[in-house]
Structures are given as C-alpha cells and as structure tokens.
Amino acid sequence: EGGPLDAGTVMFTDFTLRGTWMAATDSGTFHDFTFTPGVSIIVSCRDQEEIDRYWAGLSAVPEAERCGWCVDRLGVSWQIVPYNIAELMANAATRDKILHMGKIDLTKL
C-alpha cells in the first residue's frame, strides 16, 4: 500500500527455494523489454534424475535448448547442469559432447 503500483502488487519478495535464499523485485514503471539469455539462472543438479525433473518443468522453447540451457514459458533462460559442470567442460571430448546436446544426458558422456 502507498507505493507506485496497484494495491496487492508485489514490489519485493524473498523466498527459499530448495534451501537457497532467493529474492525478486519489480519496477514501479513499465519497461518495454523482455528477458534475454544475457541473464540466466543456474540449477546445479546432483544426478540425471534431477536434470530430467527440472528440464521437464522448465523447458518451454525447444528451439532454445542448447548445451544444458533452456527457456521457460516466461522467456527466462535456465542452465540445468550437473554439479560438476566445470570439471566436465575441462575435458575436450566431454565438452564437445555437451556442446552438441540440448538437455545434458550424463549417460552419453
């Protein structure tokens, strides 16, 4: 109440997502832009089951699926990757396989 937006509009919130503190904020004015892959959210997954679950829930733009990246129904880019992605990408052969995948499939690495 008393802010620049309509009553009931969320301007700032924080929440916990699977044990991780997250925060979100909105602007009081309209902006004529959308989300781009320049900003993405990384989800570090323990195993293939977790990768599959996040992917199924988030990926909504099949043509945007590249090397573990997907785009949700709102246009937000996500990186759904194994917890050891840096180690995997350090190996040239493994990196080449990942770069040719949409959703990362650990069984093919």
What are these regions (language model features)?
Residues 5-6, 49, 65, 98:
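Residues at secondary-structure transition points
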Residues 10, 36-38, 95:
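A structure-centric signal for secondary-structure junctions around beta-strands
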Residues 17-21, 26-28, 33-87:
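Vicinal oxygen chelate
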